Amino acid sequence: MARLGALVCCLLAAWHCRPGLGLPLAPAGTGPAVGQFWHVTDFHLDPTYHITGDHTKVCASSKGAEASDPGPFGDVMCDSPYRLIFSALDFIKNSGQKVSFMIWTGDSPPHVPVLELSTDKVINVTANITTTIQRLFPNLQVFPALGNHDYWPQDQLPVVNSKVYNAVANLWKPWLTEDAITTLRKGGFYTQKVSNNPKLRIISLNTNLYYGPNSVTLNQTDPANQFEWLENTLNISQQNKEKVYIIAHVPVGYLPYARGISAMRKYHNEKLIDIFRKYSDIIAGQFYGHTHRDSIMVLSDKKGKPVNSLFVAPAVTPVRSVLERLTNNPGVRLFQYDPRDYKLLDMLQYYLNLTDANLKGESNWKLEYNLTQAYDIQDLQPKSLYKLAKQFAIQESKQFIKYYKYFFVSYDSSVICQGKCKIFQICAIMNLDVISYTDCFRQYHMKHRL
């Protein structure tokens, strides 16, 4: 693999285009100003990406498969060229949106065979993206979370201090306090209050410790004592009357495109769900990446009352495997919240039509949808999302057809999700623990004899 730093510098120097601006949403009414923050995830930079006549050699991340239709902003068989990542961040910079902070939920390196990377190469990729963000947003507070690819070998994030943990702690020092840096070095997680929102706390979890492929943490009930730390942190926040946003890479709950598969080990998923239910009165939102798709989840308590809203953001990378027919257009998103109590009010999803951008040779990031307007709901509170999910479950639901289009970031609106496909989605949206999830499938089986 070519030297990552040199190639990135070369790509940056070659950049001349400016992305088109999306449609900013001005706060309405005479109430207090609406708070805003950006969420970006899964950049997956592939520095080997280049245009060549041999489509099997366009990028290392295609693993020898032919690129589909490679252009300046990438290809669906490849991870992101630097130009795509820069266009996303430059769009954010020039969008006209005033924000308090940004969350970045991990995965900077490409999907390549393990021997094509190393600890130093992984750190170098993370450093390249970190310095790009810091250069474009010198005065913006950014809260990162580590992804399963932000380590080498991938997925094997440890429970003790490591070279990667030390490296990201040093890279992210401009954004974080000394206390946050200390726990980041120890276990890859941290907490910190938002500087201009004194009663809002960010908790950045290292959920990669619970990820199935992580053999380092196999059979450990509380890797790196993160559960104990999380409960202590939430307990103190509760006493101090703070609100909390949870950010992480690997999400809780079940994957919406397969039956019975949770993104993390079931024991750890159940433990996290128990903690989130216990402190749902102060957790004002949860934000994840990892799946590359756009999805929502609603956490209910054991009596079935919706108590938490969860959002999985789509990736910037458009990559798909040879076994997949569909993928996502690149996306970034903007959340709006009430600055008085930090309740989530709305979300604006922006995207880049990759085919169009490659044809025109310039990026034109656009507003894909505004969540409350698209679904005619009041806000992003658990009650509103739960009601929306109930509408999704209706047969021939136009709302669900729209949701599934957005699931792939408007990559292919002709695809229909029905039958088992729809059941997978509905059960995953509304049921995050094993008992309710299993019961969801049982009810559908009895009703539809599937």
Swiss-Prot record:
Tree of life domain: Eukaryota
Signal peptide: which range, if any? 1-22
Disulfide-bonded cysteine pairs: these are: 59-78, 417-421, 427-440
Q: What binding details are noted for the cofactor?
A: Binds 2 Zn(2+) per subunit.
What top-level class of enzyme does the UniProt entry assign? Answer: hydrolase
Residues that bind Zn(2+) 2, according to the entry?
Answer: 107, 148, 249, 290
GO CC annotations?
extracellular region; extracellular space
Give the catalytic activity.
2',3'-cGAMP + H2O = 5'-pGpA(2'-5') + H(+); 5'-pGpA(2'-5') + H2O = 5'-GpA(2'-5') + phosphate; a ribonucleoside 5'-triphosphate + H2O = a ribonucleoside 5'-diphosphate + phosphate + H(+); ATP + H2O = ADP + phosphate + H(+)
Q: Where in or outside the cell is it found?
A: Secreted
Q: Which residues are glycosylated?
A: 124, 128, 219, 235, 353, 370
Which molecular-function annotation in GO is an example for this chain?
phosphoric diester hydrolase activity
Gene3D superfamilies xrefs: 3.60.21.10
Family membership: Belongs to the acid sphingomyelinase family.
How does it associate, per the subunit comment? Monomer. Homodimer; homodimerizes following 2',3'-cGAMP-binding.
| Name of the featured protein | Cyclic GMP-AMP phosphodiesterase SMPDL3A
**What organism is this sequence from?**
Bos taurus
